[in-house]
Amino acid sequence: YVKQYPDRVVIENPGGFLDGITEDNIITHPSIPRNKLIAETLQNLKYVQRTGQGVDIIFKDMVSMGKPYPRYRSFNDAVSLTIFSAIDNTEFVKFITEVQDKNSKIMPLAEMMILRDLMDNRKEQLSELSRKVQKSLDETKKSCNELVNSGLIEIVSPYYMPIVPLL
């Protein structure tokens, strides 16, 4: 089912998540097709590709547009996805656009999510960032190091923090 509201779109699908998929690993879990009709509909909306990157695309689009993260919920008999329309932070959108234009490359999703989190929370430990981006500690540290090397965040042990003038 697709339900459209003024502030969000809710997509519901009968049946729970497939084995191994949870709300806490939906971004990084390998894609497993579940409902061909919904996949085709989302593909037509340009939110899904056949390569199994639909969740990544939805998250990346929402983050880069300054919107809340998409919300996945699993119930015993259904899964729902809520995509919000409101823009939470226009300054973050401008910032990400400037960084990507300056570097002439699209920022990876994990790095965008880390920056967004640090902008919202001002400081965070690696373990918490790892949980939020749904990656291993090593993968998250690598993303953080990229941001440190780019001059976007700094380490004030044990925290990662945004460079104040940037965010």
Q: Predicted regions: what is each one?
A:
Residues 1-167:
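C-terminal regulatory or interaction extensions
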